Amino acid sequence: MSEKTDLSELRRGTELVKRGFARMQKGGVIMDVVDAEQARIAEDAGAVAVMALESVPADIRKRGGVARMPDPDIVPEIIDEVSIPAMGKSRIGHTKEAEILESLGVDMIDESEVLTPADDRYHIDKRHFTAPFVCGARNLQEALRRIDEGAAMIRTKGEAGTGDVNQAVHHQRNIKSSIRELVGKSYEERERWARDHEAPAELVHETAEMGRLPVVNFAAGGIATPADAALMMHHGCDGIFVGSGVFGAENPRAMGRAIVEAVNNWDDPDELAQIASNPGKGMKGEANADLSEGEKLQTRGV
């Protein structure tokens, strides 16, 4: 006699379900929001999901201090305001912030380097949560470590809050280049690569056989214009996270719509030219080259 299937387990919490939810966001734009009003603007602009946080990354940079999870009073307001999925950011290694966000009902948790890390050595063990996680990565080995911990989605770290897409491009190219390298290696060479890069061997082999990451891979960090979003899609990303680029712009509604349209038409230069002329002035931005090592967020959590 076959074992009885637990339908509640199938609906939520399994690795298959968590990765499936992440795949449902593919081809879309996820926007950072700090309150219900911004969440409404994001949904009206065509976002596939919103990400709740205390402040957008550009404001976190300006303000300094300790950046934490969003106010627990604000999260339910954001969830109730929109019909699209609502996500929330937690600090790296802060298991309790993640548990609170899950209890509040968020659809996904971003263990984010944008917030002040709670643990300099360890990330959250994401396998035991029912909510899926997204994590940032600068290269393939970081991405595979996060997937091994239970991440259902990877995103480039980029350099959040700068409006400079340079590092997001760099990180995406790093990941794709390493995957191409692995595809051409023998079993023994992949095992050696896994040891040398402190990456889980099983995932190294799986990635090489698939020719891509085992989970969806979004772009994030410094995306500030429709052209930036289209560029990251050109480089093979599955979708886009954007925060300061929308609500730091002169006209957030128009910029949000334009970025969504750019993702939908990333391979049509004529359409992109029309889209890029509509949203008005973007955020001011700060060049990555001007940042000191201490000002870089991407180095948090390896």
Swiss-Prot record:
GO terms for molecular function: pyridoxal 5'-phosphate synthase (glutamine hydrolysing) activity. It comes from the Archaea. Its EC number is 4.3.3.6. It is an enzyme of class 4 (lyase). One of its GO terms (biological process) is pyridoxine biosynthetic process. It catalyses: aldehydo-D-ribose 5-phosphate + D-glyceraldehyde 3-phosphate + L-glutamine = pyridoxal 5'-phosphate + L-glutamate + phosphate + 3 H2O + H(+). NCBIfam families: PRK04180.1. In the presence of PdxT, forms a dodecamer of heterodimers. Catalyzes the formation of pyridoxal 5'-phosphate from ribose 5-phosphate (RBP), glyceraldehyde 3-phosphate (G3P) and ammonia. The ammonia is provided by the PdxT subunit. Can also use ribulose 5-phosphate and dihydroxyacetone phosphate as substrates, resulting from enzyme-catalyzed isomerization of RBP and G3P, respectively. This is Pyridoxal 5'-phosphate synthase subunit PdxS. It comes from Haloquadratum walsbyi (strain DSM 16790 / HBSQ001).
